[in-house]
Amino acid sequence: MNQSPAAFGPRRGGSPAVVAGAGARRNESQDYLLMDSELGDDAQPPLPAYGYYPCLRGTDSRLTHRRQTVLREKGRRLANRGPAYMFNDHSTSLSIEEERFLDAAEYGNIPVVRKMLEECLSLNVNCVDYMGQNALQLAVANEHLEITELLLKKENLSRVGDALLLAISKGYVRIVEAILSHPAFAEGKRLATSPSQSELQQDDFYAYDEDGTRFSHDVTPIILAAHCQEYEIVHTLLRKGARIERPHDYFCKCSECNQKQKHDSFSHSRSRINAYKGLASPAYLSLSSEDPVMTALELSNELAVLANIEKEFKNDYKKLSMQCKDFVVGLLDLCRNTEEVEAILNGDVEIHHSGGDHYRPNLSRLKLAIKYDVKKFVAHPNCQQQLLSIWYENLSGLRQQTMAVKFLVVLAVAVGLPFLALVYWFAPCSKMGKIMRGPFMKFVAHAASFTIFLGLLVMNAADRFEGTKILPNETSTDHAKQLFRMKTSCFSWMEMLIISWVIGMIWAECKEIWTQGPKEYLFELWNMLDFGMLAIFAASFIARFMAFWHASKAQSIIDANDTLKDLTKVTLGDNVKYYNLARIKWDPSDPQIISEGLYAIAVVLSFSRIAYILPANESFGPLQISLGRTVKDIFKFMVIFIMVFVAFMIGMFNLYSYYIGAKQNEAFTTVEESFKTLFWAIFGLSEVKSVVINYNHKFIENIGYVLYGVYNVTMVIVLLNMLIAMINSSFQEIEDDADVEWKFARAKLWFSYFEEGRTLPVPFNLVPSPKSLFYLLLRLKKWISELFQGHKKGFQEDAEMNKRNEGKKFGILGSHEDLSKLSLDRKQFAHSKQSSIRSSEDFQLNSFTNPPRQYQKIMKRLIKRYVLQAQIDKESDEVNEGELKEIKQDISSLRYELLEEKTQNSEDLAELIRKLGEKLSMEPNQEESNR
């Protein structure tokens, strides 16, 4: 039987050879599927074939058909390789055998690759094509799993790391698992090594070609998998011990950071961003952390801080911060019952449920969300419903009542506030006491108390609504020996009530500072308003008291003289006479005048404090938020405004300061007059004649006209309209997301009443309740017991150290053992400290020794739902061009597999026919021999 030419040999000759037997039929069957890589127009030069060397038939139709098929195959190859293929010749360093091997690996010709790997011992499996890619890279790029597995069995295979990164980027899970089973990843060190570290070791493990790597030099497999949101691949890498190292602090001055910054600052910044992209990936957050909610919240805040530090990458960091926030919102959205919502909002549910009968969720995660401005998380319906149930604690029936009923409840609480306070003093654990401890009742009680305080401020000025009874140039006394200042500086009963309210509010603020700490207290702007209001009230009352004290001293001098009966008939000394003068004759720095001025400012701030409770209402809440944003815009605008204002004020003053008394008015002649004129010019209340001079100095006057006109154009037309545009933009931002903004502001208001304590409103909080005294005694007892235990523990440690010293002194065996045990304990302590720092990122594979708590079970359920939802969303995306290309590659690979199966079947059939023919030919011979 004639054999076909060598399976891997080039085509020779110009006419088709006639081959007999099964081999000819086998080659004919491959004529339509295994084509040459090129075909000339007339001649037939030596061409590489994909499969076994085909025999051509002599008919013109068959030759024409083959040419058309080859041209189609060639066009597909050009399309796959891109335009660069048309401008790059085949590498002269490659043999025809290597070219055929690379083509077979690229197009999924499994039979050829297997046969060449088995039979061609001189084949270089690391040979590269015109683009510098070897067979492994080509097979992975075209998703040929079987070829990848065949190549991975070869020793000294290069660029395995780049193939892994390529498979991760394309999401080929099975290929990734196959590559990870390679001996190079047995120890796990390669997974933690980036391409840049491999280059330092002069290793081409992650190299794409001789020029460098395919991906960024700092990208490790786990970082790339996190970037691509490949959950299954991330899980596989995590199980093999891969982790993403958190970048050092931005201001870190360690030797490693300094070296990277000096060598290439841009690469250092990009490596930090790539690491944070991996850490902020939902795939990595959900699979790597024991507490993904806590990790995501902390990371979102860290990224927001970096966005303000690294301005050049601000958008990247803000996007990553928002990605972490969206991840937390996604987990909250997947909750199906109250227990799961509580687990996300509180953290470890079991620990906090063990607090006692009066359990109230601590909402530790929600505190962080409010602190880090995760507004969508706080405003989520699941979170809001949980907050609403806590808000109406012990008053669940009031939640469904109408607004009229709620208003009546508020009115009843305001009227009966003294009675409710009395009940809570003596029976804090009664039913009424529990109702008073509820957040809603605390809010109503505090709001009613503050409303009464504002009413007192109004009533304190009610006697002057129709005008003061004593004119500024008049004096009035109750009796003949009384000084006028004794009547005006003494405190009325209304003012004494106001002082009691102010002292109560100061005490409440002191308790809040003690509870929260100074840093957290100053973080809230409303606390700054309260602090300013109370400080001004206190300064006003102190100044008023000083005026009263000085007047009392003068009055005591009068009272000590029994001969004085009527002050109007005697001449008083200077130290006494002043306190009997009319208001218009008082010193400008008189304590009572200062007190009245400060009191007026404090009253304005007190009424502005009403805005704090406006977020409780859906109608007024967005308006209050817009007002707060407007105030921020005004402060930003004031920087530019002050620069322009001061420039023109100093310029106009320098121009007109020499013309005092020579102008039609005093504008711009002094700094004070310059300020007044320019300030009121903003509102159109300054006159044009402010720049006119009475003398014939036209040059100065014309310059004044020009500067004054430029000022009005700049301030009124440009800057004021810019301020209006800024305010309008801020209001539109609030309006576009009004529901989220309002719910977030309302949650912040509610949260201030969720904490234990501050049950009694002002001024009833000044009287210590029996409950407070009881808790104070308990704390003192606990402190004293801890103090004695500390001394006792210190004595025990001293005794133990003495024993050890005696053991060393007398040479007792085991002293070295004790020292080794002590050093071991120290090492274990240091190790536990480091592990606690990394606990939020590392897996704790101790579920067999430490069974998971309820919180861990809940988080595991939520993470499963999140991963499944992410996979469903990914699968529901439309088929893109890359997926169509993958389908083509699969069809191409299937073609070669079918051909191999057909060839094998043909060989088996030919063998059966041969055996059958031999058997049939042997039967006549046996019959003849039998005869």
From Swiss-Prot:
One of its GO terms (cellular component) is slit diaphragm. Residues 13-24 have a biased composition (Low complexity). It catalyses: Ca(2+)(in) = Ca(2+)(out). The modification Phosphoserine is found at residue 815. Keywords: ANK repeat, Calcium, Calcium channel, Calcium transport, Cell membrane, Glycoprotein, Ion channel, Ion transport, Membrane, Phosphoprotein, Repeat, Transmembrane, Transmembrane helix, Transport. The keyword Isomerase does not apply. Disulfide bonds: none annotated. Residues 1-406, 460-487, 543-592, 658-674, 728-931 are cytoplasmic. Glycans are attached at residue 617. GO terms for biological process: calcium ion transmembrane transport; positive regulation of calcium ion transport; positive regulation of cytosolic calcium ion concentration; regulation of cytosolic calcium ion concentration; single fertilization. NCBIfam families: trp. PANTHER family: SHORT TRANSIENT RECEPTOR POTENTIAL CHANNEL 6 (PTHR10117:SF7), TRANSIENT RECEPTOR POTENTIAL CHANNEL (PTHR10117). Homodimer; forms channel complex. Interacts with MX1 and RNF24. This is Short transient receptor potential channel 6. It comes from Bos taurus.
